[in-house]
Amino acid sequence: MSKAGGNKGGVKTGGRGGAGSSNLQVRVKKKAGTIKESSRRWLQRHLNDPYVHKSRQDGYRSRAAYKLIEINDRYDLLKKGQKIIDLGAAPGGWSQIAAKIVGSTDENPHVVGIDYLHVDPLPGVVLLEMDFLDDEAPQKLMDALGDKPDLVISDMAAPTTGHRRTDHLRTVHLCEVAADFAISVLKPGGHFLTKTFQGGTENELLALLKQKFRSVHHVKPPASRAESVELYLLARDFKG
């Protein structure tokens, strides 16, 4: 999970079954007419997830925080003083980690997040409650940040339909929009990290990123559930 050298900025990390995990399994009983079987399974998995327990212990907004921690431990993306834009920020886990590592404060914010869902305030983070797909969103993000970002991160995913190919295509579209934005605003040498789903239709996106960045590859951090089709695309060293 972590590369040699350990944590950045004092951020805590956790592995599968790490501190706070337990062999005691929580079982969610189904009462007739009260909960769907699929919902019961999701709730039981959530309640028994060691990352969920650890996120509560460490004070993180969500288990997704560990995905960014683990990716950063491996690739050293986040550094003190950087400017960061977080797309699809709710509930705030990635913005929270980014602000802590880069040293963002309310007086001198270096992290701007955007989501159409409400995100409770976070220290050192400017939060925009609007849809990133709105025409005005890109300029509002840049105005709030006040400078070109060193890193654009996106954990956006379209609401799932249950149809794997449809879900993949909708999320790839969000990736493409996020990539276009990152390419238009990043500093030379900057990085772009975005969620995608396994599905094999992102060839055009990969070709674009390989043209604009010096290194592009897929990443699946340990905090991403093994059974999930979720992957991350990491594009490093923007050519400008």
Swiss-Prot record:
Top-tier EC class: transferase
Location relative to the cell: Cytoplasm
InterPro entries assigned to the protein according to its UniProt record, in alphabetical order: RNA_methyltr_RlmE (IPR050082), RNA_MeTrfase_FtsJ_dom (IPR002877), rRNA-MeTfrase_E (IPR015507), SAM-dependent_MTases_sf (IPR029063)
Functional note: Specifically methylates the uridine in position 2552 of 23S rRNA at the 2'-O position of the ribose in the fully assembled 50S ribosomal subunit.
Protein name: Ribosomal RNA large subunit methyltransferase E
Chain segments carrying region Disordered: 1-27
Bias-annotated ranges (Gly residues): 1-20
GO cellular component annotations of the record: cytoplasm
Species per Swiss-Prot/TrEMBL record: Brucella anthropi (strain ATCC 49188 / DSM 6882 / CCUG 24695 / JCM 21032 / LMG 3331 / NBRC 15819 / NCTC 12168 / Alc 37) (Ochrobactrum anthropi)
UniProt-annotated binding residues for S-adenosyl-L-methionine: 92, 94, 115, 131, 155
Family: Belongs to the class I-like SAM-binding methyltransferase superfamily. RNA methyltransferase RlmE family.
HAMAP family per the UniProt record, alphabetical: RNA_methyltr_E (MF_01547)
Coarse class of the protein's main subcellular location: cytoplasm
EC number: 2.1.1.166
Any GO molecular function: rRNA (uridine-2'-O-)-methyltransferase activity
Signal sequence extent: none
Active site: 195 (proton acceptor)
Catalytic activity: uridine(2552) in 23S rRNA + S-adenosyl-L-methionine = 2'-O-methyluridine(2552) in 23S rRNA + S-adenosyl-L-homocysteine + H(+)
Keyword terms of this UniProt record: Cytoplasm, Methyltransferase, rRNA processing, S-adenosyl-L-methionine, Transferase
Matches recorded under Pfam families: FtsJ (PF01728)
TM region(s), chain numbering: none
